[in-house]
UniProtKB/Swiss-Prot annotation:
Protein name listed in UniProt: 4-hydroxy-3-methylbut-2-en-1-yl diphosphate synthase (flavodoxin)
EC primary class: oxidoreductase
Keyword 4Fe-4S tagged: yes
Gene name linked to the record: ispG
Pathway the protein contributes to: Isoprenoid biosynthesis; isopentenyl diphosphate biosynthesis via DXP pathway; isopentenyl diphosphate from 1-deoxy-D-xylulose 5-phosphate: step 5/6
Cofactor field: [4Fe-4S] cluster
GO function terms (MF aspect): 4 iron, 4 sulfur cluster binding; 4-hydroxy-3-methylbut-2-en-1-yl diphosphate synthase activity (ferredoxin); 4-hydroxy-3-methylbut-2-enyl-diphosphate synthase activity (flavodoxin); iron ion binding
Family label: Belongs to the IspG family.
The protein's Enzyme Commission number: 1.17.7.3
Cofactor note text: Binds 1 [4Fe-4S] cluster.
Amino acid sequence: MNTLQRRKTHQVRIDHITVGSEAPVVIQSMTNTDTADAKATALQIKELSDAGSEMVRITVNSPEAASKVAEIRRRLDDMGYATPLIGDFHFNGERLLAEFPECGKALSKYRINPGNVGKGVKGDEKFAFMIRTAAENDKAVRIGVNWGSLDQSLAKRMMDANLASSAPKPPEEVTKEALIVSALESAEKAVLLGLPEDKIILSCKVSAVQDLIQVYRELGSRCAYPLHLGLTEAGMGSKGIVASTAALSVLLQEGIGDTIRISLTPEPGSPRTQEVVVGQEILQTMGLRSFTPMVTACPGCGRTTSTVFQELAQDVQNYLRQKMSIWRTLYPGVESLNVAVMGCVVNGPGESKLADIGISLPGTGETPVAPVYVDGERKITLKGDNIATEFLAIVEEYVKTNYGENGSKRNQNKIIPIQSL
């Protein structure tokens, strides 16, 4: 098995979660409720946490929102959820933290955008107040720079210097450098203001895949801070998923990235939890972490003119996800389970043998039977109208036997070993 080389960084503690170096890449999400509605926000955080989000960011943009943060924390604690809350501050964060000190205490991390804290001396004072508040409350800070809200005074200074140079760079290259400089200079200021280096996480978000890869490669080479990855706006549907996967997979494979968020634009009627599931699937398909049993299924072809195997694959995936809230506690290691649902004799038996448990359904013109393979061996053949029910029962029994208290696969974790550079 290959060993993935991760950047060696400071390790940042955010409540019970460790971020950086050999620590697992952490999945983050963000609510879209009105934070002033404490009940709705707490319930959505619960939903995101149930889906697998390990930290959740909430908007703190008004006195009404700030006044409810402590209540949101209490509601989550009462429900048994220790999910760390990240306060997303823009424009007026210092005022809200000053007026509502319990807000700052209830949060586990502050997100500060240097581009919209303020200009000149006044902006420096606002930034300083927020950093000192974080230090006093022993909270972590993500200094998050965005392409769309870059500090314009810094950008102008760097553009002017570029024009005056003997070999000026294209403006877009200067803008990328300004993103990095903004993050690094802000982190340096934060340390001088008393925030320890192991309380700082950086991000430099843009919307284009190649730009994100370039910026993070450079940022990662110039600091030892953990990095939060994500496109500023990935977009809707398959475009958003593909863009996020393309960008983050390259960086993660190079050992860059310690927390991730998939910033999908929700489609009408789609669950907010989709961004969490996509993040999990990126990490799991790369072999970096395991969250839920994965289903391998063939794409179908002229040999599989029926939809039986597709329906069974979907049923199995849904069943596994629904069971994980219980299985995660009862059967440690079950998240590494691999199930194959194949549609014909061409690759069906082979893929089924390679999975922990697999079924090869008959293709067009094949004998209407479905052999089931367990740990590489053919164990039983199913046929008739109850194949789905019978196969799920076999999966259930396999999980109990192999991941139960005395199971041989209990606590096993099939992930790529991690080393720090």
